[in-house]
């Protein structure tokens, strides 16, 4: 060991001496004596490695307390951190999809703080059913006879098929054999549910007679799958649920539909593209309809199945139902969200998803212009900060070809180097509340459709 190396080692402090320093008192109070000591030992090992490798001390050796504080602060951050979503995708799967209404947030908090009547009947002190209250709400909204709630729509489809068609055939149009995120494919789900897929028609055209010819003594269901995350256009043909229900009645085969996103209101009244609604399919005679809780409905992640009482009963009694059931927090949030639909005149104000989707491009443009000046003052030396028109998307496989006119703040490096955009985006991701945009066409875009808290936005970007 050289004299220089020995000198560097001698500069490393003893843990006991560090802990006696007043700057470590608050750290020990906040993070605990054990964790602080554990980290100091780790840092001493790191420092010795640096000395051996480069004959120097790490820069943080000048202020051990500051480095410990920085590391423990970062360590204490939740894995699920709030972010500002300016990607232009309203229902962003990677960012948690639908924001919850205040009523849903309050309902979840209450359910977490207190015992609740999850499966308890106050009338007779007996055991109740956890889906009952929500089933009544869903029946009121959709016109269905009964309802069942599980933890997501993939689970809903799995349960629906396993409980009603295991060991039998399910007839589906080839053009509806969808794949959604995470390689969730309808054929794979059918296989897991114990069903045999009988695909009919072609990718772009399927006729009623294709279904008719496929039905045999082993057919359990005729199934429709709403292609909510892609669109086939041009020379196409598909039969709707009403026509398929009529055929099913003739052949004595029930019809079920995986609706995917599942809007409970006619979106066209808000100037948005129309999506099929569960209540329309129930009115058409579909036996079971499944859809998501956290997409266009604007609630928590959940799989909802509405339909005929006898078929829902088969789902409720299936062993998979217990494995897939929703917990009390999900049910509390979903109930509070569904109650908002009982007052449709206030829905676009109280339901965040609908509120964000219905923001006009003009309002967003004015917001962008209002925010431009302070950002130019802060970033103008390195970037051209402009207000640009853009198109938002709904996201989560909803209305894939439809875009919503919006406005964005864009950042273009004066030197034209793309690495500066990557660096800026990375800096914003490291903020206490990360700001998430997207890089496209030589610019960093911040689509403001989902920006409601301007003050927090400016506090982050002007740091």
UniProtKB/Swiss-Prot annotation:
Top-level EC class as recorded in UniProt: transferase
Coiled-coil positions: none
Keyword Transmembrane attached: no
Residues with PTM N6-(pyridoxal phosphate)lysine: 295
EC nos: 2.9.1.1
Matching Pfam families: Se-cys_synth_N (PF12390), SelA (PF03841)
Main location: cytoplasm
Protein name per Swiss-Prot or TrEMBL: L-seryl-tRNA(Sec) selenium transferase
Organism this protein belongs to: Shigella flexneri
Highest classification ranks of the organism: Bacteria, Pseudomonadati, Pseudomonadota, Gammaproteobacteria, Enterobacterales
């Amino acid at each position: 060991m050289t004299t220089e190396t020995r000198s560097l080692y001698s500069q490393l402090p003893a843990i006991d001496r560090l802990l006696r320093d007043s700057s470590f008192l608050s750290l020990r109070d906040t993070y605990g004596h054990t964790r602080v000591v554990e980290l100091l030992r780790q840092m001493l090992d790191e420092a010795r490695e640096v000395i051996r490798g480069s004959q120097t001390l790490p820069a943080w050796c000048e202020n051990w307390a500051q480095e410990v504080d920085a590391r423990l602060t970062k360590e204490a951050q939740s894995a699920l951190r709030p972010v500002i979503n300016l990607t232009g995708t309203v229902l962003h799967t990677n960012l948690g999809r639908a924001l919850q209404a205040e009523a849903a947030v309050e309902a979840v908090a209450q359910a977490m703080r207190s015992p609740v009547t999850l499966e308890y009947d106050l009338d007779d002190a007996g055991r109740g059913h956890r889906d009952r209250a929500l089933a009544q709400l869903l029946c009121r909204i959709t016109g269905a006879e009964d309802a069942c709630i599980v933890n997501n729509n993939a689970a809903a489809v799995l349960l629906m098929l396993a409980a009603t068609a295991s060991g039998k055939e399910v007839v589906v149009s080839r053009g509806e054999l969808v794949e959604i995120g995470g390689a969730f494919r309808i054929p794979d789900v059918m296989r897991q549910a114990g069903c045999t897929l009988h695909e009919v028609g072609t990718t772009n055209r399927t006729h009623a007679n294709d279904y008719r010819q496929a039905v045999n003594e082993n057919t359990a269901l005729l199934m429709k799958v709403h292609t909510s995350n892609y669109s086939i256009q041009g020379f196409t043909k598909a039969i709707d649920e009403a026509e398929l229900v009529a055929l099913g009645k003739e052949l004595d085969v029930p019809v079920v539909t995986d609706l995917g996103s599942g809007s409970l209101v006619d979106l066209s009244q808000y100037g948005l593209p129309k999506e099929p609604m569960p209540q329309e399919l129930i009115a058409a005679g579909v036996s079971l309809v499944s859809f998501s809780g956290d997409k266009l409905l604007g609630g928590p992640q959940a799989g909802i199945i509405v339909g005929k009482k006898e078929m829902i009963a088969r789902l409720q009694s299936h062993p998979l139902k217990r494995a897939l059931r929703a917990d009390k927090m999900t049910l509390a949030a979903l109930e509070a969200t569904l109650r908002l639909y009982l007052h449709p005149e206030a829905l676009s104000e109280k339901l965040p998803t609908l509120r964000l989707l219905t923001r006009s491009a003009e309002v967003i443009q004015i917001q962008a212009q209002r925010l431009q000046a302070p950002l130019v003052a802060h970033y103008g030396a390195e970037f051209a900060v402009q207000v640009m028109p853009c198109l938002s998307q709904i996201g989560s496989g909803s209305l894939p070809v439809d875009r919503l006119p919006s406005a964005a703040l864009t950042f273009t490096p004066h030197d034209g180097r793309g690495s500066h955009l990557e660096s800026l985006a990375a800096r914003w991701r490291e903020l206490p509340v990360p700001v998430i945009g997207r890089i496209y066409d030589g610019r960093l875009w911040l689509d403001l459709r989902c920006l409601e808290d301007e003050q927090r936005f400016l506090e982050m970007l002007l740091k």
